[in-house]
A protein has these predicted regions:
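Acidic, polar-rich low-complexity tracts and alpha-helical solenoid repeat scaffolds
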Residues: 1-236
Length: 236
């Protein structure tokens, strides 16, 4: 049947997205996009059209057309909110907005994943990027909450913030402590850190928050502030 032919073409085109050596074949993604478009037009009620849209968006990314990929992802989000691809798609949308400095829109996309809960494999990464989206909007009071939530999530699955994680994770955790310290610095300094932990409870990684803030002040030659941070930590 025509439908089976189209689906066979789509399957074949999926295989063309990358060559045997992992290198993209220039004609492959474009051919795939046309096949996906035919499926969507001819069979609008096909039960796997969320997968068709997902593959179509990836194909647009393959040929360097992120704006077109975004249009397809927006359609997937609108028409298939419970698709198995939805959290990845929300994250990719968040990244699209973030690199274009549309931080409010990025906040919304990352937030959609957090609403889904910790069962999403993108949950922790979304917390991290949401913290950055808030920080970029100068929402310094909100950003630390998201970062702390990310650290809490890591600890809940047995991760020790004091241990040596894998390189990519180490960068994320180190960056988290750094931007939390920057947020507190923008809010006023050591007394703000004290108030935060007094209000929200002590954290096992509080020493790293104080330490990073102290190092930040020291690097800026703000020696009195640095000393004040270390004194606050000792007193807490």
């Amino acid at each position: 049947s025509q439908r089976q032919d189209l689906l066979s073409d789509a399957s074949a085109d999926n295989d063309l997205l990358t060559g045997a050596g992992g290198e993209p074949i220039p004609a492959g993604p474009r051919e795939a996009i046309e096949t996906y478009r035919k499926i969507l037009e001819t069979y609008p009620n096909y039960e796997r059209n969320d997968q068709v849209l997902y593959q179509m968006s990836r194909a647009y990314d393959e040929i360097g057309q992120p704006d077109e990929a975004m249009k397809v992802m927006d359609r997937l989000v609108a028409e298939y909110p419970y698709s198995k691809y939805i959290d990845e798609v929300h994250f990719r949308r968040g990244e699209y907005y973030f690199v274009r400095k549309k931080y409010f829109d990025a906040e919304s996309a990352y937030g959609a994943i957090i609403t889904m809960g910790s069962t999403s494999s993108y949950y922790e990464l979304a917390l991290y990027k949401l913290g950055w989206a808030l920080y970029k909007q100068e929402l310094y009071e909100d950003a630390p909450h998201r970062y702390m939530a990310m650290l809490e999530q890591r600890q809940s699955v047995g991760y020790d913030c004091g241990e040596n994680p894998e390189e990519s994770e180490e960068h994320r955790v180190t960056d988290t402590f750094r931007v939390v310290s920057l947020s507190f610095s923008n809010l006023g300094g050591p007394e703000v850190v004290d108030e935060y932990f007094d209000e929200h409870g002590h954290r096992s990684y509080a020493d790293k928050i104080y330490g990073n803030l102290g190092e930040f002040y020291f690097s800026k030659l703000r020696y009195e502030d640095a000393a004040s941070v270390y004194k606050s930590f000792i007193n807490h």
